[in-house]
């Protein structure tokens, strides 16, 4: 069976809602939820969702032998990371002092307790949970048809800090600006949940299933060259 889109299953994440949302925007595509490295390698596109703790995520990825399959997919085909699937693409997470996949340069930091208050001094809760505006930091095909400042749904206590500003494709505020979307080569990854973000999320997923990364050159070469 030819697989158009593989949704990576490493035992963590709301995989059914992700796969159903993709099937909704791509009804003729073959969408498979899989933990098979071979299926991931054969798929035309890969979606890498996830939720939970970074240490648990990395343990499950390695237990299933998925590390190399994920890295290869990120370097060779359209690849969408979602929530924890975005965070572990980076080098290190403060959560459990966890070494991550190291596909993208940067780290993952917890929202600092001392900064979590609004302009009137009211305490803000962690995790950051609910709808928030997303500002497009750079043009990208996955933003097509989505207004700058559109609202998406978030659930997270940690956020990524890329060491290369050119990676930043979108940001939000809680209560300070933080990166919520990155783009590099074949990779687009988001902190929010497009599958829970109604029309805006479905638009982004629809853009992903038709995206040809070769038509959108990235400033960062994943083969190992430095980012310009």
UniProtKB/Swiss-Prot annotation:
The active site is at residues 83, 193, 195. Pfam families: GATase. Its EC number is 4.3.2.10, 3.5.1.2. Residues 4-218 form the Glutamine amidotransferase type-1 domain. Gene3D superfamilies: 3.40.50.880. It is found in: Cytoplasm. GO terms for cellular component: cytoplasm. One of its GO terms (molecular function) is glutaminase activity. Keywords: Amino-acid biosynthesis, Cytoplasm, Glutamine amidotransferase, Histidine biosynthesis, Hydrolase, Lyase. It comes from the Bacteria. Its main location: cytoplasm. GO terms for biological process: L-histidine biosynthetic process. It catalyses: 5-[(5-phospho-1-deoxy-D-ribulos-1-ylimino)methylamino]-1-(5-phospho-beta-D-ribosyl)imidazole-4-carboxamide + L-glutamine = D-erythro-1-(imidazol-4-yl)glycerol 3-phosphate + 5-amino-1-(5-phospho-beta-D-ribosyl)imidazole-4-carboxamide + L-glutamate + H(+); L-glutamine + H2O = L-glutamate + NH4(+). The keyword Cell cycle does not apply. Transmembrane segments: none annotated. Pathway: Amino-acid biosynthesis; L-histidine biosynthesis; L-histidine from 5-phospho-alpha-D-ribose 1-diphosphate: step 5/9. Coiled coil: none annotated. HAMAP family: HisH. Heterodimer of HisH and HisF. IGPS catalyzes the conversion of PRFAR and glutamine to IGP, AICAR and glutamate. The HisH subunit catalyzes the hydrolysis of glutamine to glutamate and ammonia as part of the synthesis of IGP and AICAR. The resulting ammonia molecule is channeled to the active site of HisF. This is Imidazole glycerol phosphate synthase subunit HisH. It comes from Thiobacillus denitrificans (strain ATCC 25259 / T1).
């Amino acid at each position: 069976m030819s697989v158009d889109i593989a949704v990576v299953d490493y035992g963590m994440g709301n995989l059914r809602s992700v796969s159903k949302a993709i099937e909704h925007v791509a009804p003729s595509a073959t969408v498979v939820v899989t933990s098979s490295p071979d299926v991931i390698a054969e798929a035309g596109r890969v979606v890498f969702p996830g939720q939970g703790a970074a240490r648990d995520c990395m343990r499950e990825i390695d237990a299933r032998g998925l590390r190399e399959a994920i890295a290869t997919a990120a370097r060779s085909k359209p690849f969408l990371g979602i929530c924890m699937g975005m965070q572990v693409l980076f080098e290190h997470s403060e959560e459990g002092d966890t070494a991550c996949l190291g596909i993208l340069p940067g780290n993952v930091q917890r929202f600092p307790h001392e900064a979590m208050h609004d302009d009137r001094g009211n305490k803000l809760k962690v995790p950051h949970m609910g709808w928030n505006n997303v500002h497009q930091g750079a043009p990208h095909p996955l933003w097509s048809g989505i207004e700058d400042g559109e609202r998406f749904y978030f659930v997270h206590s940690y956020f990524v800090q890329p060491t290369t500003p050119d990676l930043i494709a979108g940001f939000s505020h809680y209560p300070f600006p933080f990166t919520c979307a990155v783009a590099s080569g074949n990779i687009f990854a988001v902190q929010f949940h497009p599958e829970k973000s109604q029309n805006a999320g479905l638009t982004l997923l629809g853009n992903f299933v038709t995206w040809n990364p070769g038509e959108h050159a990235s400033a960062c070469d994943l083969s190992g060259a430095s980012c310009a």
